[in-house]
Amino acid sequence: MEKFTVVNSVAAPLKIINVDTDMIIPKQYLKTIKRTGLGKGLFSEQRYKEDGSENPDFVLNKPAYRNAQILVAGDNFGCGSSREHAPWALADFGIRCVISTSFGDIFYNNSFKNGLLPIRVTHEQLDKLFEDAERGANATLTIDLEKQEIRGPDGGVINFEIDPFRKHCLLNGLDDIGLTMQKKPSIDSFEAREKVARPWL
């Protein structure tokens, strides 16, 4: 998993509340268990017209936001069914951080496991971030995980909370497999002892 330390990027404003996981990645893209390639399906029903061409009015299709690594979204982002494909699709598209006032619980937990940082802010802070994001290429946000800060284009700072363990995992690029591999010497030692103590196993 890629480490998350500091991200400096324009932020795409998605002023929609209750964005559910089916909107993030529709069901037809759930046949795969690969984490790569899902970026093309991200918000596909909003990004594309019926003929398959791009919808120029959707925020992620606008030139200023095509390479955005930060998404500023309305309340209750990631609600709905529990599909890990949602953070996979966001990450594959290039999104590293989603900022909202609230998140669906399962999406919130899955995000950390896949290198995606979900940040909760107040409604007042979200309104300010939407204002910054709508300036497009003329304004970038900086997400500093170590300092737990969102720095705006005009020097303003918003502090955010994060569980210390989740922060450690993101800073060090540790997913569940990475955490297990940290314990490999202890696991190997245990298995060696068990082979001697219980050779029939």
From Swiss-Prot:
One of its GO terms (biological process) is L-leucine biosynthetic process. GO terms for molecular function: 3-isopropylmalate dehydratase activity. It catalyses: (2R,3S)-3-isopropylmalate = (2S)-2-isopropylmalate. SUPFAM superfamilies: LeuD/IlvD-like. Catalyzes the isomerization between 2-isopropylmalate and 3-isopropylmalate, via the formation of 2-isopropylmaleate. It comes from the Bacteria. InterPro entries: 3-IsopropMal_deHydase_ssu, Aconitase/3IPM_dehydase_swvl, AconitaseA/IPMdHydase_ssu_swvl, IPMI_Swivel, LeuD. This is 3-isopropylmalate dehydratase small subunit. GO terms for cellular component: 3-isopropylmalate dehydratase complex. Belongs to the LeuD family. LeuD type 1 subfamily. It holds the Pfam family Aconitase_C. Heterodimer of LeuC and LeuD. Its EC number is 4.2.1.33. HAMAP family: LeuD_type1. Transmembrane segments: none annotated. Pathway: Amino-acid biosynthesis; L-leucine biosynthesis; L-leucine from 3-methyl-2-oxobutanoate: step 2/4. Keywords: Amino-acid biosynthesis, Branched-chain amino acid biosynthesis, Leucine biosynthesis, Lyase.
